[in-house]
C-alpha cells in the first residue's frame, strides 16, 4: 500500500515537472517558440547547432556577410569586372601619362553680361581615353552604352572649368550623361553642361568694340605627368551650331588652343581653351545713344535764330537740352561696369554735352552784351536832346523795348532802309545830329557796338555746326 502511494506521488511530481517545463519554454524571456519543421526546411536541432556555433565564435548575434550592403552587380558590370579592379587609381598608374582626348560641341551661347563681365554657354563635353581594365570579350565587337550610374563606379577624368562662376549638368528628364565602352577598353564619356565663366572685357572702344572670351578646361588633380589632355581632332574638335546668335553681338570666330598652366604648389597642368570673338552690333546704340545726343546738340543751335531779347524762349531751350544730355549719359553708364578708363561712347556724349553747354553760355554772353548796350543807349538819350521835330513826350517811347505799333506813333516816321525798331533810336539821333562832328564820333562807336552784338549769334550759326561735323568725322574715322 505504501509502495502504491509512493508511485502515485512520483507520477504526480513528474506530471507537475513536465507542466512547469512546458510553461517555462513558452514564456521564458528571449526565447522563441519554433514551429515544427516544414518539409524541405532544416531540422530544428541543426539550426540550433548553427546558432550555437555563432556564439562559440564570440559574437552575440548572427554575423552578416561583409558586402551585404552592396548593391548587386548587373550582368554588364560583371562582364566589365568592376569588382576586380581598384578604379580609384587612374589607368596605368605608375607608368606614362594617360592620354585623354577632348572634343566639344557648342549648343548655344546664352548671354553676355558687360556688367558682370561673364558669359553663359551650353555645350556637349566629350572625353576619350583607354582603360584596359574595362575590356571585355565580344564576338561581334559591339560597344556597350551606359548611363550616369556606372560613372560613379569607374575612373573618369576630373575635368573642371577654370574661372567658372556657375556650372551644372542637365538632368531633364534624366542626367544628361553617357558612357560608352568598347571591347578593347576604349571609353567615351559625354555630358551636357551649362557653364557661366568670367571674360575679361576691354570697353575702351565701347560700343564699337570687339571682345575675345575663352572657356578653359583643365584637370583638377592630375598634372601633365599623370594625364595628357589634348584636343582629339585639333581645330576640328570644336563644333558649333550654325543657329547660334546674340542680340548685341556678331560671333565672328571659334577656335581652340592648348597651353600649360603652372601652380606653385602642385606643378604643371594641361589646359584647353575654347576661344571665340564677338563684335558688337552698333545699330542699337546708334538709335539709343548717338542719334538722341546728336539731336540734342542740333536742337541747342535753334536758339541762335531766336531773338536775343526772347529770354523765356532761349533759356528753357538751353536748360532742357542740358538736362536731356545728362539723362542720356546717366542711362548709358547705368548699363556698364564702373571702369576706371574712358570709353568711346563717353567721348562722344561728353563732347556733345560741351556743345550744348556752350550754346547756353553763348546766349548768356549775348544777353549780357545786349544789357550793356541798352544801358549805353539810355545814357546816350539822356545826353542828346531830340530835335527831330517830334513832340518831346514821344521821346520817352524810344526805348529798346518798344514795339512796332509804338514806332508807328512817331508821326509816321520809318527809316529809309526798313530797319527794325530796335535801331530807331540811333537813326533818329543820327538824323538830328548829322552835321555835328561830335555826334559822328558817337555814331561810329554805337554802330560798332551793335554790329558786334549781332555777330555773336551770326557767327555761332556757322561755327557750332561746322565744329560738330568736324568732330564727328574725326570720331568715326578713329573708332569705326
From Swiss-Prot:
Pfam families named in the record: Neur_chan_LBD (PF02931), Neur_chan_memb (PF02932)
Record's signal peptide: 1-21
Region of interest called Disordered, as start-end residue ranges on this chain: 29-67
Description of how activity is regulated: Inhibited by TPMPA, a rho-specific antagonist, when forming a homopentamer. In contrast with other GABAARs, rho-1 GABAAR is not inhibited by bicuculline when forming a homopentamer.
Segments traversing the membrane: 282-302, 315-335, 347-367, 459-479
Keywords, comma-separated and alphabetical: Cell membrane, Chloride, Chloride channel, Disulfide bond, Glycoprotein, Ion channel, Ion transport, Membrane, Postsynaptic cell membrane, Signal, Synapse, Transmembrane, Transmembrane helix, Transport
Residues that bind 4-aminobutanoate: 126, 190, 218
InterPro entries for this protein: GABAA/Glycine_rcpt, GABAAa_rho1_rcpt, GABAAa_rho_rcpt, Neur_chan_lig-bd, Neur_chan_lig-bd_sf, Neur_channel, Neuro-gated_channel_TM_sf, Neuro_actylchol_rec
CC terms in the record's Gene Ontology section: chloride channel complex; GABA-ergic synapse; glutamatergic synapse; intracellular vesicle; plasma membrane; postsynaptic membrane; presynaptic membrane
CDD domains: LGIC_ECD_GABAAR_rho (cd19005), LGIC_TM_GABAAR_rho (cd19059)
Catalyzed reaction equations: chloride(in) = chloride(out)
Family from the record: Belongs to the ligand-gated ion channel (TC 1.A.9) family. Gamma-aminobutyric acid receptor (TC 1.A.9.5) subfamily. GABRR1 sub-subfamily.
General function of this protein: Rho subunit of the pentameric ligand-gated chloride channels responsible for mediating the effects of gamma-aminobutyric acid (GABA), the major inhibitory neurotransmitter in the brain. Rho-containing GABA-gated chloride channels are a subclass of GABA(A) receptors (GABAARs) entirely composed of rho subunits, where GABA molecules bind at the rho intersubunit interfaces. When activated by GABA, rho-GABAARs selectively allow the flow of chloride anions across the cell membrane down their electrochemical gradient.
Name used for this protein in its record: Gamma-aminobutyric acid receptor subunit rho-1
Origin species: Mus musculus
Lineage start: Eukaryota, Metazoa, Chordata, Craniata, Vertebrata
Amino acid at each position: 500500500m505504501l509502495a502504491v502511494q509512493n508511485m502515485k506521488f512520483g507520477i504526480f511530481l513528474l506530471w507537475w515537472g513536465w507542466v512547469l517545463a512546458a510553461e517555462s519554454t513558452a514564456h521564458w524571456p528571449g526565447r522563441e517558440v519554433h514551429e515544427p519543421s516544414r518539409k524541405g526546411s532544416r531540422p530544428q536541432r541543426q539550426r540550433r547547432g548553427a546558432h550555437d556555433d555563432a556564439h562559440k565564435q564570440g559574437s552575440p548575434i548572427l554575423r552578416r556577410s561583409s558586402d551585404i550592403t552592396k548593391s548587386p552587380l548587373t550582368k554588364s558590370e560583371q562582364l566589365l569586372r568592376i569588382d576586380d579592379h581598384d578604379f580609384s587609381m587612374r589607368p596605368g598608374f605608375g607608368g606614362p601619362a594617360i592620354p585623354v582626348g577632348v572634343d566639344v560641341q557648342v549648343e548655344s551661347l546664352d548671354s553676355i553680361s558687360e556688367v558682370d563681365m561673364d558669359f553663359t554657354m551650353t555645350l556637349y563635353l566629350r572625353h576619350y581615353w583607354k582603360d584596359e581594365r574595362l575590356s571585355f570579350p565580344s564576338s561581334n565587337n559591339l560597344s556597350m552604352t551606359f548611363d550616369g550610374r556606372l560613372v560613379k563606379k569607374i575612373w573618369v577624368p576630373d575635368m573642371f572649368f577654370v574661372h567658372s562662376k556657375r556650372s551644372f549638368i542637365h538632368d531633364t528628364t534624366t542626367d544628361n550623361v553617357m558612357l560608352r565602352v568598347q571591347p578593347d577598353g576604349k571609353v567615351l564619356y559625354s555630358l551636357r553642361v551649362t557653364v557661366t565663366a568670367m571674360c575679361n572685357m576691354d570697353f575702351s572702344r565701347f560700343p564699337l568694340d570687339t571682345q575675345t572670351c575663352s572657356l578653359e578646361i583643365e584637370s583638377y588633380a592630375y598634372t601633365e605627368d599623370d594625364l595628357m589632355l589634348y584636343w582629339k581632332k585639333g581645330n576640328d574638335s570644336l563644333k558649333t551650331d550654325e543657329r547660334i546668335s546674340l542680340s548685341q553681338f556678331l560671333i565672328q570666330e571659334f577656335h581652340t588652343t592648348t597651353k600649360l598652366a603652372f601652380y606653385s604648389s602642385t606643378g604643371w597642368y594641361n589646359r584647353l581653351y575654347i576661344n571665340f570673338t564677338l563684335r558688337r552690333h552698333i545699330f542699337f546704340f546708334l538709335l539709343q545713344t548717338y542719334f538722341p545726343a546728336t539731336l540734342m546738340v542740333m536742337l541747342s543751335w535753334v536758339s541762335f535764330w531766336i531773338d536775343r531779347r526772347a529770354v523765356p524762349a532761349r533759356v528753357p531751350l538751353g536748360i532742357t537740352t542740358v538736362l536731356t544730355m545728362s539723362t542720356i549719359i546717366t542711362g548709358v553708364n547705368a548699363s556698364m561696369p564702373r571702369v576706371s578708363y574712358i570709353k568711346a561712347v563717353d567721348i562722344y556724349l561728353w563732347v556733345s554735352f560741351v556743345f550744348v553747354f556752350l550754346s547756353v553760355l553763348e546766349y548768356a554772353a549775348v544777353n549780357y552784351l545786349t544789357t550793356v548796350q541798352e544801358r549805353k543807349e539810355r545814357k546816350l538819350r539822356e545826353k542828346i536832346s531830340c530835335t527831330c521835330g517830334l513832340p518831346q513826350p514821344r521821346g520817352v517811347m524810344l526805348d529798346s523795348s518798344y514795339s512796332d505799333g509804338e514806332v508807328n506813333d512817331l508821326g509816321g516816321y520809318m527809316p529809309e532802309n526798313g530797319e527794325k525798331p530796335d535801331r530807331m533810336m540811333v537813326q533818329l539821333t543820327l538824323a538830328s545830329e548829322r552835321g555835328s562832328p561830335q555826334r559822328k564820333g558817337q555814331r561810329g562807336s554805337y554802330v560798332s557796338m551793335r554790329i558786334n552784338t549781332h555777330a555773336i549769334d551770326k557767327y555761332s550759326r556757322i561755327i557750332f555746326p561746322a565744329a560738330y561735323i568736324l568732330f564727328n568725322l574725326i570720331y568715326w574715322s578713329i573708332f569705326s
